[in-house]
């Protein structure tokens, strides 16, 4: 058993650690489940956010700034979404900030208790003085340690996404995405 602990410890030590972890070898962003990550901080898994700052740097170090719980569900103007009356849902908004660039990521969670549904979205806000180019922004990411899980999603053509599909989540990456081609 000691050999496996030593081996695991060496692996974690080689992974990138945030400055705040100091010499703590048991902490690594590369092995911990995280809510929403940005490129370039020692987590070598697929990140939800990739940006480029005006100076060419491509790292965003998102840190917790605040949260707010409000009645009703958040709105996504111009995008498809679930709707609810104010008394049918609540919104949890968690704000993460990259202090170097001023970029804020607003993580939005729509909670529908009667339906057993949680919706997710991300809104980005540049509060800095320089432009930030967004290369990739996913509405969510989930890290799970080894469990027996299924993903349930709906697919179909435009305004007809009603075909339910259940997929077993095995080792590795699983994603669902939509490809939309805009015409002029």
PLM feature segments, named:
Residues 1-184:
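Polysaccharide-binding surfaces and accessory modules of carbohydrate-active proteins
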């Amino acid at each position: 058993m000691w050999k496996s602990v030593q081996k695991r410890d060496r692996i974690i030590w080689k992974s990138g650690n945030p400055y705040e972890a100091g010499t703590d070898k048991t902490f690594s962003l590369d092995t911990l489940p995280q809510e929403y990550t940005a490129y370039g901080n020692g987590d070598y898994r697929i990140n939800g956010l990739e940006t480029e700052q005006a100076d060419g740097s491509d790292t965003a170090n998102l840190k917790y700034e605040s949260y707010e719980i409000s009645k009703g569900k958040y709105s996504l103007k111009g995008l498809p979404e679930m709707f609810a009356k104010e008394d049918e849902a609540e919104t949890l908004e968690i704000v993460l900030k990259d202090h170097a660039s001023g970029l804020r990521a607003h993580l939005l969670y729509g909670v529908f208790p009667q339906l057993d549904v949680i919706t997710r979205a991300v809104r980005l806000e540049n509060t800095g003085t320089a432009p930030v180019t967004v290369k990739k922004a996913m509405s969510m990411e989930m890290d799970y340690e080894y469990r027996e899980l299924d993903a349930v999603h709906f697919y179909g053509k435009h305004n007809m996404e009603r075909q339910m599909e259940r997929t077993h989540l095995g080792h590795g990456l699983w994603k669902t995405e939509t490809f939309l081609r805009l015409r002029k």
